[in-house]
Amino acid sequence: MKLSFTKMHGAGNDFVVLDGYTRALPPLTGAQVRALADRHFGIGADQLLLVEKPTVDGADFKYRIFNCDGGEVEHCGNGARCFVKFVRDHGLTGKASVRVEVKHGVITLTMQDNGEVVVDMGAPVFEPARVPFDASGLDGRREGADTLWPLPVNGVTRWISVVSMGNPHAVQIVDDAEAFAVRVDGPAIECDPRFPQRVNAGFMQIVSRHEVNLRVYERGAGETLACGTGACAAVAAGIRRGRLDSPVTVHTHGGTLTISWNGACDERAPLMMAGPATTVFEGVIELPA
């Protein structure tokens, strides 16, 4: 079967986008997702995104995300920006703002006149059981309004914030994000048994109260050039700990995101993420068996 696709990226976090809205697509197996995402023998991507018809009232589209390991995940902020650019560029909507169904609810995506996309990422969740994170038997340490949890990582105790942005995140503050051994500690944190669904590991260096450098080791994808939900989780943790003030410029290896959150006044407030969305090329590929 021939499969039309669009290759896109948001701040270097790259995606294969498939249109399941105007045409019926067969259910993709994990092996097929891995083959399409393979950078040597496939198209190459951190994630595969599916555009589908919504199944809930009030949504314009349904947005599904598969990591390059073949597993379906809850959310991807950089992918969300590419999603709205895709549906507008392909004539699926003329709206500047669209409401999109994801696993944990409905989010709003808005295309700005300057070509950037603003995503209402929803409110963060800090309650360990809802991340989910097993905090049983641990003595947390308060910093500001946040609780830091001790996690043994390769023989060293790391103090982490746990945050859900619809997907789980563990955030730690480091002195130098560029020099930190992200690809050593990242896999250990991702697979720590206290995270029953595994976790995205964020490593944040605070430059000023409005600026950070961030690297994220993503669950099921490894270190990526940018992670939108990871940027939101890091900023939320930093504001909650009293280290950051909104808005925050987040520098990643792939580009810059701007995160705004009124959480110092109301933790139920949604995080707003602004950043680029870019189409790289379009093509047709034979769907692997």
Swiss-Prot record:
Keyword Amino-acid biosynthesis found: yes
Gene Ontology CC annotation, any one: cytosol
Active site per database record: 76, 227
Gene Ontology biological process terms in this record: lysine biosynthetic process via diaminopimelate
Subcellular localization, as worded in the UniProt entry: Cytoplasm
SUPFAM superfamilies named in the record: Diaminopimelate epimerase-like (SSF54506)
Pathway assigned in UniProt: Amino-acid biosynthesis; L-lysine biosynthesis via DAP pathway; DL-2,6-diaminopimelate from LL-2,6-diaminopimelate: step 1/1
Superkingdom of origin organism: Bacteria
Record site feature (Could be important to modulate the pK values of the two catalytic cysteine residues), residues: 169, 218
Quaternary structure annotation from Swiss-Prot or TrEMBL: Homodimer.
UniProt protein name: Diaminopimelate epimerase
Organism encoding this protein: Burkholderia pseudomallei (strain K96243)
Gene: dapF
